[in-house]
């Protein structure tokens, strides 16, 4: 899980979602998981 101020899709399988008011990226590739902090 990377914590970034700007979350971006890193590949075409990445999905940008909102959970509990936080913007997150979920993906099939675990290296692409990100959340805004």
Curated annotation (Swiss-Prot):
User: What InterPro entries does the record point to?
Assistant: Ribosomal_bL36, Ribosomal_bL36_sp
Q: Which GO terms describe its biological process?
A: translation
Q: Which GO CC annotations does the UniProt entry carry?
A: cytoplasm; ribonucleoprotein complex; ribosome
- Extract one GO molecular function annotation from the record: structural constituent of ribosome
For this UniProt record, the keywords arranged alphabetically read as follows: Ribonucleoprotein, Ribosomal protein
The record ties this protein, via SUPFAM superfamilies, to:
Ribosomal protein L36
Which protein family is named in the record?
Answer: Belongs to the bacterial ribosomal protein bL36 family.
Q: Which HAMAP family match?
A: Ribosomal_bL36
Protein name listed in UniProt: Large ribosomal subunit protein bL36
Q: Which gene encodes it?
A: rpmJ
């Amino acid at each position: 899980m990377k914590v970034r101020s700007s979350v971006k899709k890193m590949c075409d399988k990445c999905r940008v979602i909102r959970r509990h008011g936080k913007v997150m990226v979920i993906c099939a590739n675990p290296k692409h998981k990100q959340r805004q902090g």
